[in-house]
Amino acid sequence: MLSILNNNGKPYVQMVTAGFSGCRAYRCDFPATAINWTGGIGVHVIEVPMPLLDNGILNATRAFMFKSPGNAVCYDMVCQLADIKDKAGFRLVADYDDQPVYIKGCISLPWEPWGPTKHKLEDDQWFIKMAPLFDTITVTNEYLARELDAITNTHNYVVVPNTVPRWLFSAPRKPQLAEDKTKFVVVGSGCPLHSTGPHKDENGKDVEGQPGDWASAEWIDFIKEGVSEGYIDYIQMGGPNWMLEDIKDKIRTLPWVPPLRFPSLISRLNADVVLAPLVDCVFNKCKSDLRLIEANVCSSAIMCSTFADGPYENAHQLCKVSQGATKDQLKDILFTLGKKDNWNEVIEYGWRNILDNGRITESDQALERYVKLFGSTPEKVVPFDIM
């Protein structure tokens, strides 16, 4: 009879995933692909919508990793696995990247149309119930680990930063500048749910538009002036930005694309500068620095909002934008970045950030983080019968 047990003992990791978001792509799909093609780290990842509990597969499973579990169905699955994990010899791991959780009051963004919904609060309660059942919970930054542990008091949080897959971000490394830049290809993006255009409520009453993260500085005025004066060639990703409606014929707008297509798309744009606006709030402190490392791997500079415990504190000093910055200050930052010596330093700094800190998905340092989560190869496998 064919057996999936082999000399590695327990070679399989079951990643229980759902959805098609960028969170799943960067936290599950891309790492799983890199782990599986190397073959030399002793595990093979199987992405599944629910745990596979056939005796043969279960006895070959070293770990179950759940992506953002937060409902009654997930809770039931995790409870059942927690009851048998010690006897069956596997680890239970959960991953929450920027999962909205109830930290210091409502974490919902104030401009989200749904506000602090019952749905989100219910998610938080399931999370709190499940937290003690996991051997390890991975998150993307120290702030999220610290704040979640203050709620659950489980001390099982490990920071696993996001990484970028070099095989998908395939743009060649840009050469150094020989002269200063005076014109810039600038790319802005962001979830359309993080800003709300003017609309009518359920009673037909007019509701003013909310700018969301674009309110963190005079970003919109800065973009409009740059486009008008010809020093910014602006590309809006993720669909139309309602605040740029009056210059829509002077800019390029690209629709949302699936996560697997996004890296090659943004690489082909050959952006000089990527905009990363964020307001200073709890939700954004829970976010990762993904936009920063995406810019780094594309040899692009970035202009990013910074604040205490924010995700972009590791950006080059010349790239940082303070809360409330004026359009003139933003313009000064842009042209300061365009000075050839500054530009070359910033781009090199970005590459050193991702290479030296294991922020490339297929790097040994990045893969080792996952191997540690899944546990070492057992010396002896004792078969377990789930029946």
Q: What is each model feature region?
A:
Residues 83-84, 102, 115-137, 151:
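Membrane-proximal helix-turn-helix segments that form the acceptor-binding/catalytic region
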Residues 135-149, 153-170:
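Donor nucleotide-sugar binding/catalytic pocket of nucleotide-sugar-dependent glycosyltransferases
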Residues 1-74, 106, 201, 384-387:
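N-terminal pre-catalytic "stem/leader" segment of glycosyltransferase-like enzymes
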Residues 19-37, 162-268:
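Conserved catalytic-core segment of nucleotide-activated headgroup transferases in glycan assembly
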